[in-house]
């Protein structure tokens, strides 16, 4: 039986979602474990985060991954990794620790883990974490959320159906309650539950990963188990969900559905517009306004209540897009952008805005160069679009 797996990887950004881990027991053709490697080790979205739980732990800023699930087998075990990214993996180091046992009962259940996603979640239907058929016991999951609307993503009731029942024998009271926390989620780690990732702003694009392990309280089933959770109260949200479920059951198991392609697993890794350079903002004095200047280009932005921050979106190199936020604004609030130019040169100006239910409508009103002023047509950007 395998008792411990350790890996550390050097690869392109978001490799945790691009490298697929599979495990096969006793010569089976269909894997009993199939998941992006980062999600299997408890952290979603292809990101690296520390995590400390009983069966899974990650350290070194999430780059050292350890698994302690017991994985028995009778005759053989085969573990594979497949790189579905565009670049070769620079380094892949691993240990797999196992012991030869005198014997195992023939009905010993084997370890299973499956990645699923629904992007976006469908109205009127619970998100399905696991559907398994046979005899075994469910031992937990992790769930990753990418917000498509602002606010609290939770309040979805968990519903677990055992052996084909029409009404769930386990019916919870809210997302954070199933994941053993309360009054929302915050980053925390415990032996059987925790939250390695919760971006604090709860804005469009914010990401979270939570976990719950039923080790002292496994959920047994004789014929089948179906583990589901609402996405928002009464399924009123359409966030992007992904998960890994963990369970033990006797083989053969039903084959898993085909894993979604890598680009579908990374909806937040946005391609950069051409010639885009991230600014280095420095606050400057500008009377009653908030003003920031890019230390490299000299570009300045001034407005009321202006705050630089990092957005929840990443480019394809793994860097988060910076943003300037204006808060406490009303109709007519303005932001003024200025930058040095060379006399006689021509310039194209491209403005990029994030969209979301709290982003407002933006009107580009005109360009002023010294004593010259150029009026633009009322070019309205509807930031309320999703």
Report the location of each language-model feature:
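Extracytoplasmic
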Residues: 162, 268-386
């Amino acid at each position: 039986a395998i008792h411990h797996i350790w890996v550390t990887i050097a690869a392109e950004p978001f490799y945790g979602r691009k490298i697929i881990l599979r495990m096969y027991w006793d010569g089976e053709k269909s894997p009993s474990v199939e998941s992006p490697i980062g999600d299997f080790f408890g952290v979603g979205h292809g990101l690296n985060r520390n995590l400390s739980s009983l069966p899974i732990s990650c350290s070194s800023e999430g780059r050292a991954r350890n698994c302690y699930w017991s994985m028995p087998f009778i005759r053989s075990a085969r573990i594979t990794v497949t790189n579905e990214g565009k670049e070769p993996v620079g380094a892949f180091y691993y240990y797999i620790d196992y012991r030869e046992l005198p014997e195992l009962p023939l009905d010993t259940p084997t370890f299973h883990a499956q990645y699923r996603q629904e992007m976006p979640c469908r109205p009127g239907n619970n998100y399905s974490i696991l559907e398994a058929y046979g005899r075994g016991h469910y031992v937990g999951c992790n769930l990753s959320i990418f917000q498509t609307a602002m606010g609290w993503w939770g309040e979805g009731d968990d519903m677990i159906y055992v052996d084909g029942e029409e009404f769930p024998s386990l019916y919870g009271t809210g997302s954070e309650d199933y994941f053993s926390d309360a009054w929302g989620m915050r980053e925390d780690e415990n032996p059987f539950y925790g939250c390695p990732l919760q971006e604090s702003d709860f804005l469009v694009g914010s990401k979270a990963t939570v976990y719950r392990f039923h080790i002292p309280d496994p959920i047994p089933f004789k014929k089948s188990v179906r583990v589901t959770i609402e996405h928002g109260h009464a399924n009123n949200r359409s966030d992007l969900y992904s998960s890994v479920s963990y369970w033990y059951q006797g083989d053969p198991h039903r084959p898993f559905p085909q894993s979604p392609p890598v680009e579908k697993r990374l909806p937040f890794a946005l391609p950069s517009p051409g010639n885009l350079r991230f600014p280095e903002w420095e606050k400057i004095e500008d009377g009653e306004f908030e003003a920031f200047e890019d230390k490299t280009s000299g570009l300045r932005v001034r407005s009321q209540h202006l705050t630089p921050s990092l957005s929840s979106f990443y480019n394809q190199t793994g860097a988060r897009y910076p943003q300037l936020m204006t808060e406490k604004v009303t109709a007519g609030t303005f932001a003024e952008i200025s930058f040095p130019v060379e006399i006689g040169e021509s310039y194209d100006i491209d403005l990029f805005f994030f969209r979301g239910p709290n982003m407002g409508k933006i009107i580009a009103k005109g360009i002023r160069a010294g004593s010259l002023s150029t009026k633009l047509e009322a070019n309205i950007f509807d930031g309320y679009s999703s």
